[in-house]
Amino acid sequence: MYYIGIDLGGTNIKGALVSETGEIAREVSRPTRVGLGAEAVCDGIAAVITELSSGVDRTSLGGVGLGCPGTVDDETGRVLYANNLGWKNFDLRAEVKSRTGFDLRIGNDANVAALAEALVGCAKGAQSAVIVTLGTGVGGGVVLDGKMLTGYTGAASELGHMVIRAGGEECTCGRRGCFEAYASATALIRETKRAMAAHPESRMHAAAEENGAVDGRTAFIAAQRGDAAAPAAVDRHPG
């Protein structure tokens, strides 16, 4: 029996066809295309599922699971709020089912990542564990006494939106000083752009031009080339 797992991120949609023991048989990744709207994102999810299930007998597929950033209703598959996707009360489960025929199980991305680590990963055998996910945003998942800690609204372990500096950098959620506003790829890109504006001679400009945009790699590439300004973009912290 095989299963399909999808990681919906603010930058990429990643999927895998896995066995019952967690062994990966096939992997797929494509851009999320958040800027094109929810329909385009759902089309991308459907394309990933279609590619992963190609050539696999549906009777051999035990199910499809998707991890989504933000607050998710695990029972209905509705995304209550996902700031990095711009979604509020969005019926993701229904949208993907209408495109693929698969009835997905959907949960918060960091929660399901924590569950996977507890079942077959580095936290296997542990009664309690905490996982922090880093990407476009910052997520958190908590396993407490062998059970997922989700809270009444499913947002109990949203570690990325703990305020670590009152009145600090603005977060995509609208608040200021969140962990995510300092430790995510979004924060790194912001700091890289600031460093580039302050240092027009920096090699970060050439690195960004080569990649077609300023992204999470820009400062690291420039630093590897000996750029003096690039390390500051990476090393900045709220302390």
Residue map of PLM features:
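Acidic/polar active-site rim loop that often engages polyanionic ligands
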Residues: 27-28, 73-78, 167-173
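Glycine-rich phosphate-binding loop and adjoining helix at the ATP-binding site
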Residues: 33-34, 38-46, 50, 54, ...
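Short glycine-rich, Thr/Ser-proximal phosphate-binding strand/loop in the N-terminal lobe
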Residues: 2-43, 78-81, 154
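Glycine-rich phosphate-binding loop of actin/hexokinase-like ATP-binding domains
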Residues: 124-183
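Short glycine-rich anion-binding loops that position phosphate/pyrophosphate groups of nucleotides
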Residues: 11, 69-72, 135-137
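A cytosolic small-molecule/anion-sensing beta-strand core signal
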Residues: 19-20, 68, 75, 108, ...
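Short glycine-aspartate micro-motif
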Residues: 3-7, 61-65, 105, 129-133, ...
